[in-house]
């Protein structure tokens, strides 16, 4: 029996599945304030012709505010250095992610951005939520392209 996941991670996973169907790497994100999703996005690098169009970046932009200190970000994959930097600059309160990313991740892998003394903001960190489903989406997507 699988463990139920948060409805916010469930939404991020639905966005990731839609991204895969559109030919994008399956990553989705949802930004939550006061128990409600206020912004969401999936990877759209191919669709937008923009290498910075990661789900996290697009979600932060969609929120339309410089500071998001009262918000939590749910994302299906451990954020990369670019996205972790944006999360720090936006001062997001809590970061929840699904699958770890041993190659490109920057939270618990690689530069471990939020553990650096020069990082000006460190959100509360919660990894591994919905990790199995997130990892399966990524494996299936990339296996079909190799």
Report the location of each language-model feature:
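Short, basic/aromatic recognition patches
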Residues: 2-22
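Alpha-helical structural signal
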Residues: 5, 9, 27-28, 56, ...
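Generic helix-packing signal
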Residues: 16, 20-23, 33, 45, ...
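Short, basic and Ser/Thr-rich N-terminal targeting/leader segments
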Residues: 23-27, 69
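Short beta-strand scaffold segments in enzyme catalytic cores
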Residues: 27-35
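Zn2+-dependent cytidine deaminase-like catalytic core
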Residues: 39-136
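Thiol/selenol-based redox catalytic cores and closely related redox-interacting motifs
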Residues: 137-146
């Amino acid at each position: 029996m699988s463990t139920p996941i948060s409805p916010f991670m469930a939404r991020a996973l639905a966005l990731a599945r839609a991204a895969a169907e559109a030919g994008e790497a399956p990553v989705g994100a949802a930004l939550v304030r006061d128990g409600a999703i206020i912004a969401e996005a999936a990877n759209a690098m191919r669709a937008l012709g923009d290498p910075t169009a990661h789900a996290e970046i697009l979600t932060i932009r969609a929120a339309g505010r410089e500071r998001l200190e009262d918000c939590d970000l749910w994302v299906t994959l451990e954020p990369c250095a670019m996205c972790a930097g944006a999360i720090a600059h936006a001062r997001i309160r809590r970061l929840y992610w699904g699958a770890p990313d041993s190659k490109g991740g920057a939270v618990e892998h690689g530069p471990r951005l939020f553990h650096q003394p020069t990082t000006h903001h460190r959100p509360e960190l919660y990894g591994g939520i919905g990790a199995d489903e997130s990892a399966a989406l990524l494996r299936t997507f990339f296996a079909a392209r190799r």
